[in-house]
Amino acid sequence: MKEGIHPDYHEITAKCSCGHVFVTRSTGKDLNLDVCSECHPFYTGKQKVLDTGGRIDRFKKRFAVLGGKN
């Protein structure tokens, strides 16, 4: 490999707003994150499930007159 053509690849810290800190390597500067795998609802299992059942029932009732499958 040629000398002097590669960017400076060094350790950085990525700090989340929840307090979790990751150490990784990059050519950039330290990162401040809003969410991470420790606090994001998808990864923690605390997801909100949207109530779409009411919308589906309304759709079925509205278009039941057309005589489609039940």
Swiss-Prot record:
Keywords recorded for this protein, A-Z: Metal-binding, Ribonucleoprotein, Ribosomal protein, RNA-binding, rRNA-binding, Zinc
Gene3D superfamilies found in the cross-reference section: Ribosomal protein L31 (4.10.830.30)
Domain of life, per lineage: Bacteria
Cofactor(s) essential for the protein: Zn(2+)
GO biological process, one term: translation
Cofactor note: Binds 1 zinc ion per subunit.
Entry's Gene Ontology molecular function annotations: metal ion binding; rRNA binding; structural constituent of ribosome
Residues annotated to bind Zn(2+): 16, 18, 36, 39
InterPro entries per record: Ribosomal_bL28/bL31-like_sf, Ribosomal_bL31, Ribosomal_bL31_A, Ribosomal_bL31_sf
GO cellular component, one term: ribosome
Function: Binds the 23S rRNA.
Family designation: Belongs to the bacterial ribosomal protein bL31 family. Type A subfamily.
Quaternary data: Part of the 50S ribosomal subunit.
HAMAP family: Ribosomal_bL31_1
Protein name (Swiss-Prot/TrEMBL): Large ribosomal subunit protein bL31
Species classification: Bacteria, Pseudomonadati, Pseudomonadota, Gammaproteobacteria, Aeromonadales
Gene responsible for this protein: rpmE
